[in-house]
Amino acid sequence: MANPVTLPQTFLLLGSGELGKEFTIAAQRLGNRVIAVDRYPDAPAMQVAQVAEVISMLDGNALEAVVKKYQPDWIVPEVEAIRTEKLLELEAGGYRVIPTAQATNLTMNRDRIRELAAQQLGVRTARYNYATSLAELEEVSQAIGFPNVVKPVMSSSGKGQSVVNNAGEVQQAWSAAIAGARGDQTKVIVEEFIPFELEITLLTIRQWQGETLFCDPIGHRQERGDYQESWQPAPLTQRQLAQAQAIAKTVTDALGGAGIFGVEFFITPEEVIFSELSPRPHDTGMVTLISQNLNEFELHLRAILGLPIPQIKQTGPAASAVILALEAGEKLSYAGLAEALTESGTDVRLFGKPNARPHRRLGVALAQAESVDAARRLAQTVAEKVIVQTE
């Protein structure tokens, strides 16, 4: 794209969760129109978009119909469970997919992005193999060795992941992976367990023109394969940061297009090891809602539209901590907000999800402080004060 586009533009958002909601808000602040699409009604982004559509995004015909109905300027995937082969067809027919249809197709499945990174680009990753049945998983686990990590090739927010310590845990890991998979895949990836010091996300911004940009690295902690807290900046050495940026640029250049990419790494004293990549805003990047002059959603929007990004300024140590449901419920309410909001240097975002299940992420607490450790403690304190009530 040679020049910035003329506004307003129309975005078809495929996936309408909390990340899509923040992107929609960013888009609307510049007067754009958003059609929010998801498989269930009243999803978070639908509550702020001009138009909502409920379809199965794994149904290629339904996906094509909604695209042709609205004729969007941009198709912006926000989740994994999309019939990405249809996006390739739509792009070939003249529709613009962010970052590209091919990038979306590759990264929606862990096997494809892993093959690109490890085999084609020569990037250091954990040793890995695949399984499509319990019997295969038992065999592959023995070959990789214990402990190892089992993940569905297609899932979101770490769902279905397990650390397998011995052969007796393989069957449980298979069941968890299949239950946590998105889409219609029954394939898992088995990785060697990396004894890392730190997991980070490096938010990487590709522009249609101009250099690739990076946010300060974001550290994060996971439980049940899902993000629980994140903080910025993560304490990397100059050597580690340079290695991470070089790898992120190599992989995102191979994918092409424009927008923000969440590139995940394991950090050890000796190595920077590529883990995963999402071609869109990243859940751990919600800390940027308080930590940067331009948050990840605004950066994604500017990159898509070819608008200038003169400076990405990290405004001080910051952290996020998730607010989770403890049990299932169809009617939600929240207590403790008055107590939570008394803390200086903090904020709370409740996503507006219509129902709950155990450990579902319903909101996030944000905090800034004099140090990363203090910000992490403060964000956790605020998150714990918000009580999710279900009926």
Curated annotation (Swiss-Prot):
Share an example GO biological-process annotation for this protein. 'de novo' IMP biosynthetic process
Q: What is this protein called?
A: Formate-dependent phosphoribosylglycinamide formyltransferase
State the family it belongs to.
Belongs to the PurK/PurT family.
What does the entry list under GO cellular component? cytosol
Q: Is Cytoplasm included in the keywords of this UniProt record? A: no
Q: How does it assemble?
A: Homodimer.
Q: Which UniProt keywords apply?
A: ATP-binding, Ligase, Magnesium, Metal-binding, Nucleotide-binding, Purine biosynthesis
Q: Which organism is it from?
A: Synechocystis sp. (strain ATCC 27184 / PCC 6803 / Kazusa)
Under Gene Ontology molecular function, one entry of this record is:
magnesium ion binding
UniProt-listed InterPro entries? ATP-grasp, ATP-grasp_carboxylate-amine, ATP_grasp_subdomain_1, PreATP-grasp_dom_sf, PurT, PurT/PurK_preATP-grasp, PurT_C, Rudment_hybrid_motif
State its role: Involved in the de novo purine biosynthesis. Catalyzes the transfer of formate to 5-phospho-ribosyl-glycinamide (GAR), producing 5-phospho-ribosyl-N-formylglycinamide (FGAR). Formate is provided by PurU via hydrolysis of 10-formyl-tetrahydrofolate.
